Regions:
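Positively charged, low-complexity terminal tracts
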Residues: 1-78
């Protein structure tokens, strides 16, 4: 059984590679009922690869954690 999805909104691409795959943050409806923030790799034909889905609350928490990490990094090049 194949999982159904509908790409509701493209938020942005984080990276892409020479073979055409992109790592993107999007809003996706999974199985016709679950709308989630979605961070994953997509192939050039629009087929999803491995990734994670996040609720609005999880996305906010991730934003906070990333902000804290960036502040701790300061001027370090990592």
């Amino acid at each position: 059984m194949e999982i159904e999805f509908k790409l509701e909104r493209r938020i942005g691409a984080l990276s892409d590679n020479p073979s055409g795959y992109t790592k993107e943050l999007n809003v996706v409806v999974w199985d016709g009922k679950y709308t989630k923030y979605d961070l994953r790799t997509w192939n050039p034909n629009g087929k999803p690869g491995k990734g994670i889905t996040l609720t609005k609350e999880e996305l906010k928490k991730l934003h906070k954690l990333i902000g804290e990490e960036i502040r701790q990094m300061g001027g370090r090049n990592e």
